[in-house]
């Protein structure tokens, strides 16, 4: 499994061997949301970075999932339609949201690594 990268919006990304990138929300985001009850998955199409592509709803709130990089969504985790609780059970695994082909294959390296993301969470906790 490839090293995870993160966004400041608490999404994780994992580069796959086939050139695609898998996206989900971090355990921090999942815990902040509480029990996930619905996930609206994106359409299979191209999106610009920061475009809203998905929505996750919980018992506490609804939150947008934004496209982390320019690219084309090529697969969604349709299992989440019937079992959105997978996000609660395995946010970094079976609870993934979608896969996309990035316009720039190297852009993922410009996102936060684990250490930088941990510092972000710590800063948020102190704010």
From Swiss-Prot:
Record note on cofactor: Binds 1 lipoyl cofactor covalently.
Pfam families assigned to the protein according to its UniProt record, in alphabetical order: GCV_H (PF01597)
Stretches assigned to the Lipoyl-binding domain: 20-101
Gene3D superfamilies given in the database record: 2.40.50.100
Alphabetical list of InterPro entries matching this protein: Biotin_lipoyl, GCV_H, GCV_H/Fam206, GCV_H_sub, Single_hybrid_motif
Cofactor(s) this protein cannot do without: (R)-lipoate
GO annotation, biological process: glycine decarboxylation via glycine cleavage system
SUPFAM superfamilies: Single hybrid motif (SSF51230)
CDD domains: GCS_H
Residues annotated with N6-lipoyllysine modification: 60
Purpose: The glycine cleavage system catalyzes the degradation of glycine. The H protein shuttles the methylamine group of glycine from the P protein to the T protein.
Subunit structure: The glycine cleavage system is composed of four proteins: P, T, L and H.
Protein name: Glycine cleavage system H protein 1
Organism, as annotated: Pseudomonas syringae pv. tomato (strain ATCC BAA-871 / DC3000)
Lineage, broadest ranks: Bacteria, Pseudomonadati, Pseudomonadota, Gammaproteobacteria, Pseudomonadales
